Amino acid sequence: MEGPLTIPVLDKGFVRLVDQMGDDRAIVQAARVSYGEGTKTVREDAALIDYLMRHRHTSPFEMVVFKFHVKAPIFVARQWFRHRTASVNEISGRYSILKEEFYEPEAFRKQAKRNKQASEGALLDEEALALLRKVEQEAYGAYRALLEKGVAREMARMVLPLNLYTEFYWKQDLHNLFHFLKLRLAPEAQWEIRQYARAIAEIVKERVPLAWAAFEEHLLEGAFLSRTELRALRGLLTPEVYEKALSSLGLGGSRLKEALEKVFGPGEAL
């Protein structure tokens, strides 16, 4: 792998690619375990990776692993660590004196009216931002004062707010990394963690372009349909109309057949 790739995020944060094991070829090799790497072309590799993604064959994607160094506000890290399939190691406030680095948004957001856990629209309130900075200064001042009085680092840190920056290493396989990106790139994800997801997506797209294309097509921009939703579609479409629409978008052969069967079932598809 080439030198470290670092992308700035928020006002003081970043995402840095530390290491990578495997790439698109590792996915293909795992899927063709009986034959080894072989002499397949990039086009054939892309078709195989696309097949694996749309049929939810996940284990070949687990053969690719990324390790990132991340600097993010504590409240972002706590959301991040809800994804429990990764290996994580975070800077310790028991062993280190934490730096006076706080995330300060350009503007606050209003509480969403329809979603209790979301926000919407900018709240341009200089008094609110001034209050945030006041709390930061007082909290960090109290932290340093406690340390000077001999209070243990593991206890002095209790006064620090959630917008303090933390750093951690995060190692994740590609299958679960795609799941992270599917959730954290979504519009309903908190804005701050979406910025980190976008930075990671930029790196992943560059490093495994064939896998990213399949992820984007089938998971990121795709959707699952319930039984009720399928019934509604079948009531609005005929196989002939749907086939014509799919063909106009470039689908043909087995891909066209699969798409028809997905909506109308194997007994009804053309």
From Swiss-Prot:
Pfam families the UniProt entry points to: Thy1 (PF02511)
Molecular-function GO term, any one: flavin adenine dinucleotide binding
Active site: 184
EC numbers, comma separated: 2.1.1.148
Pathway(s) the chain acts in: Pyrimidine metabolism; dTTP biosynthesis
Residue interval(s) of motif ThyX motif: 82-92
Note accompanying the cofactor annotation: Binds 4 FAD per tetramer. Each FAD binding site is formed by three monomers.
Keywords for this protein: FAD, Flavoprotein, Methyltransferase, NADP, Nucleotide biosynthesis, Transferase
TM spans (from-to): none
Superkingdom of source: Bacteria
Span of domain ThyX: 13-218
Subunit structure: Homotetramer.
Protein name in the entry: Flavin-dependent thymidylate synthase
Recorded name of the encoding gene: thyX
